[in-house]
Amino acid sequence: VFVPGDTVTLGWEQFAVGLNQESREELEYLFREWEMERDPEEMIRESMAPVRQAAIGPMLVGRELEEINWEPVKMDDPRLTAHPDWLKEFRDFAWSDSSSLTLHQSARIERTEDGFQTWIYNRTDYDELLTGLEKQGLSLPTADEWAYLCGGGCQTLFPWGDGLDYSMRLRWFEDMDEDENRSYDMEEPNFFGLSIAYDPYMREVVQA
């Protein structure tokens, strides 16, 4: 998608509006449970990038997450069948109730509507990634560009405000939604049309 450029304020140092009551009560409860005598705003500030001005140029940006290292393959791919231990793990998975299985830096399998999808892990380093992108005429966003793509320069903790929206369906949170087919809200396209920064367990790579 085309993302227009702008001169924006990035980073975070204080609440623009303030936590809503539900979010503050939950944080205070967690602090009591962990026996932490700290101000929630101070703790959040320590995890944030400093406030700064940035001039962001216009750019064309991929709309969806593309995982590096993981290559989709068919189940009969020789690189899979050469590892009987992986195939045994896959067979055990097929008889389980799990939705996916990842063998660390080796292989992965997930259930789909049509059966199963498998991947193999191809090790690469940062320089190889940059070189491969350059050959395709592509590049990674800088840290400032990435922050702009996520938040558009908003000064609240989240794009929609300072507090959590408890009506949203989010990955890795207790799922209270009875409709399992409902999409995860943070994976929906944002104001730029991008699906970005929606999974804390998926690190997104930037140009550094």
Where do the PLM segments sit?
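Extended beta-strand/loop cores of jelly-roll/beta-sandwich
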Residues: 1-139, 144
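Functional-site microenvironments in short loops/helix caps that host divalent-cation chemistry
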Residues: 108, 112-208
